[in-house]
Amino acid sequence: MTAYTQTTDSMLREGESLDALGSEGLRIIQSIRGFRHSMDALLVAHFAAPRPADRVLDLGCGNGAIALLLAHRHPPLRVVGLEIQPALASQALRGAQVNGFQDRLEIVEGDLRRIGSLLPPAGFDLVLCNPPYREVGRGRLNPDPERRQAKHEMSATLQEVIAAIRYALAPKGRACLIYHASRLADLLTRLRAERLEPKLLRPVHSFLGADAELILVEARREGRPGLRVLPPLFVYQARGGGLSQAMDEIYRDLAPTLVRSGIA
């Protein structure tokens, strides 16, 4: 385990870039050719709607996009990010520093399968996660190791991810995830097996008439049964068109200049 609080490293290393992440000078450090943040981070950060007093964990935080967005949008919030890849954990740490969030954003380098030796049990009111969508052996493996590990279950299966969420959540705490729609049944089954009751679900479509590609799910530890399915979110007005009104409102609420910075 490595808990980063300060570093003497230069802000940028070879093969990295410092890019805009929303408004008012928010920046993110990321690999030029490796893993880079996507719209998924924006969607789950907005969906989670944290409360000011929430203790927040970004499980598998990558380069820190979700944690940075939350820290920027909700100034009192304190966020812990857990990431297994050392290079990405370092990027998240340095991203916190370059944005002045080092007092509110802690990055822990470690394996979520060993979360019991890294973080306290039931220590968080809200856990966010954007887990790898593909099982090993399904689909073409990305040749880049950072992207491969982010997209395929190379380091942890869905079952292991959900078990780590269950460990970290306080009683009645919330878990918010974004996942591929084709694996919705797997996700809901695993959540219930860990006594994380699905409470909210929102399908995400590219445009009207397209199948859902992603799903946003909120589950509550030891919550009562009862799932509310929210209206679908359409990212674009039409195939090849501009952002939908709903998506534009999400951008304006969370990070108004992300479209110009290239995330969309």
Q: Where are the regions a protein language model picked out?
A:
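SAM/dcSAM-binding transferase cores
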Residues: 211-264
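Short loop/edge segments at beta-strand edges and connector loops
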Residues: 30, 109-110, 179, 202
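Residue-level signal for inorganic ion chemistry
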Residues: 44, 130, 161, 219
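Conserved SAM-binding loop and adjacent beta-strand
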Residues: 29-50
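Conserved Class I SAM-dependent methyltransferase catalytic core
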Residues: 155-205, 212
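N-terminal auxiliary segments of SAM/dcSAM-dependent transferases
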Residues: 1-17, 30
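Mobile active-site "lid"/loop adjacent to the S-adenosyl-L-methionine
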Residues: 131-160, 164
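Conserved SAM/SAH cofactor-binding pocket of Class I
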Residues: 47-140
